[in-house]
Amino acid sequence: MQIPALIELTEREAIPRSLILLTGNTNVGKSLYCRQFLADRLKDDSECVYINCTSTEEHLLEWLDGIGVARTPGLHFINPYMRKQSGGGDSSVKLSNVLTEIKNAISNPRKSAIGNEGLQKKRGDDHGLQNTEKKDLTLIVDSLNHLIALFGKAAVEAFITDIYFTSKMQRLSGICALTTPSLSKDELDVLNQSFDALLEMAYKDDIDLQLRNMKMVMIRGMAITPRWVDFELEEDGTIKVLKKGSEFTCYVCK
């Protein structure tokens, strides 16, 4: 499995298929990392389910176009908030419905009509018969905080637990972002049990918030040495890993 900045974070060229929990402060770069994670997996021809409560499919596709990632029927976009709104706040719109769709995507790659807009269904009609080979499925959730706000902690915990066990039986991997601090230590410890790897982002300097870094805290079944890796956010919405002491742009001096 490949992830953005893998070599810098782990000194490995690949890691086992994993579900990763990405934690960090507000606006530290978690959403950009998730989108870059998505772009990289699409380039690898993975089926991808992208869950985001604050964006639209059109906005996501425009961003992918802007960084040169081709549109594909393997991308499934879900905005749970839009679904609840379109249902008039209907309580029957539950997180379990999303889970069912994800499992359908695993069972029927590139033939499942997943998404908030009709574009995905049209793509599936046009291309579904051309490629029914089962591929890896990547799940990106940005963010768990928004899902908790919509569905409650218990529902989200059950959702992630089910995803975790599904990943052990199917070709499923992915990443879920969580803004911290937002859960108690005990709640976070329980959530951590449903992930194979923990990735942390932080501001490097409390004064200059342009300075950011990240580290892979652990990967189950693999010995790694956690190390902080500096990065900055690019204007095109991607993440650039910095070499120590050489590439960082001083925004104060500009």
Pin down the residues of each PLM region.
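Sensor-1/coupling segment of RecA-like P-loop NTPase cores
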Residues: Y164-L183
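Short hydrophobic/aromatic beta-strand immediately N-terminal to the Walker A/P-loop
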Residues: I20-T23
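Phosphate-binding/switch loop-helix module in NTP-utilizing enzymes
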Residues: K84-K168
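Conserved P-loop
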Residues: N27-S92
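NTP-binding/hydrolysis catalytic cores, primarily Walker-type P-loop NTPases
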Residues: E232-K254
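Conserved nucleotide-binding/hydrolysis micro-motifs of P-loop NTPases
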Residues: T54-E58, Y81-Q85, L144-H146, T180-S184, ...
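Pre-Walker A adenine-sensing motif
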Residues: M1-E13
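Phosphate-binding/switch region of NTP-binding enzymes
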Residues: A177-T238
